[in-house]
Amino acid sequence: MVQAAFSPVGPTLGDAIPGFGTDGIRGRVGSVVTPALCLQVGYWVGRVLAVEGPVLIGMDSRTSGSMVASALTAGLTAAGREVWNLGLCPTPAVPLLIRKFGAAGGLMVSASHNPPADNGIKVFGANGAKLAPERQARIEAGLRGEIDHSDHDHSLCAGLRQSSDLMADYRELLLSAVGSHRLDGVPIVLDLCWGSATACAADAFQALGADLTVLHGEPDGSRINVGCGSTALGPLQEAVKERGAVMGFAFDGDADRMLAVDGRGRIVDGDHVMFLWGSVLQEQQALPDQRLVATVMSNLGFQRAWEQRGGILERTPVGDQHVHAAMVASGAALGGEQSGHILAASHGLCGDGVLTALQLSTLCHAKGITLGDWLDRSFQPFPQKLVNVTVPSQARRKAWSSCEPLVAAIRSAEETMGSDGRVLVRASGTEPLVRVMVEAADASLVDHWADHLASVVDQSLNAA
């Protein structure tokens, strides 16, 4: 195995590299996401992509985005790849434009719902899907200095094209997805969370005639996700009720996911979106095998209600790339995550928060009902509680399933709740957290076991 101290763009990083987590490379800028890392990632992405052609780069509004994108661009062009810089855009714009223009791949500079001090890199292949695990592994091998690069002609550098004009194509794709549906005069509130959604969401809803109120509607890298957006729905709920709106939509930092609220401020999460949209597709006989694809985080109430409609709910590990893979394998038309990532085969299997919001609002308007009416016809979720426990040690987070006190506590919880409850413990792929989720028909059991298991995680994995 080659152990190269240097690649053509500088020192390799050895074992001190962040790997591809649940959604790309992500971490604190300056300690994890550094210019040196981004330069090397750009170079090795350029080397590893399977086809010829330009590489697209987009970013959310984080202050560090320009640094990350510039370093990635330097690496990509050193690898001989022409770069098209989209500027501020939602994550889904990258894969959609990759396919539209036949690009070799793309990168999105974003840390999604993470705090402003973090940033990250998502990588897409020529098909618009997240890069396959074997190609991610090859990039990581390059970062560690384990790939021989002597056969590459490093004089063949490429150039940079500023391509923010391509966002007009993305906006057209959004509007074409809802066809002739309109929203004339419908009062709607959008929380754009100072992030990527500011590039297109308000324009799209206004083009359809909505009576629009916009919160946090300018790009602001120091406030992205801070007390707003899909991770903090309070401002949206208050604004919807104060303004008498019939619905509201909140996006995360890179706008690949969305959560909604109805006119009373009730939350419509990804499970409800899949159930409601899936029911429409079922009625239209446009849902192969009556199948929806969701993750292990989706609610048991959702699963049982969907099965009562004669449907199949297929579950995957957490991460929209797993949902995507399962949908491709089974031919499913709709899938997603409780957190608000929704993937539709009719829209390229790409999680798009703005598009999902447009679909929900236009479907409601076309049916002559409110989102609240639709929610009333949906399912009753089981009580569910998610507790995030900070565990700084990555090694301990990854080894949680070998912790005997925790395994024993999980077993006790499962035996107590039986078939009317479940426990899910997992290490976050994007943050230094172990997530504990408990759901059951009995809310008191949920509270007891979620708190108890979180305490066991803290005491066992953070012990000196």
Curated annotation (Swiss-Prot):
Active site per database record: S112
Amino acids binding Mg(2+): S112, D252, D254, D256
One Pfam family from the record: PGM_PMM_II
Superkingdom classification of source: Bacteria
Residues annotated as transmembrane: none
In-chain residues carrying the UniProt-annotated modification Phosphoserine: S112
GO terms, biological process: carbohydrate metabolic process; peptidoglycan biosynthetic process; UDP-N-acetylglucosamine biosynthetic process
InterPro entries associated with the record: A-D-PHexomutase_a/b/a-I, A-D-PHexomutase_a/b/a-I/II/III, A-D-PHexomutase_a/b/a-II, A-D-PHexomutase_a/b/a-III, A-D-PHexomutase_C, A-D-PHexomutase_C_sf, A-D-PHexomutase_CS, Alpha-D-phosphohexomutase_SF
Post-translational events: Activated by phosphorylation.
One GO CC annotation: cytosol
GO molecular function: magnesium ion binding; phosphoglucosamine mutase activity; phosphomannomutase activity
Cofactor note: Binds 1 Mg(2+) ion per subunit.
EC number(s) stated in the UniProt entry for this protein: 5.4.2.10
Entry similarity comment: Belongs to the phosphohexose mutase family.
Function: Catalyzes the conversion of glucosamine-6-phosphate to glucosamine-1-phosphate.
Stated name of the protein: Phosphoglucosamine mutase
Gene name tied to this protein: glmM
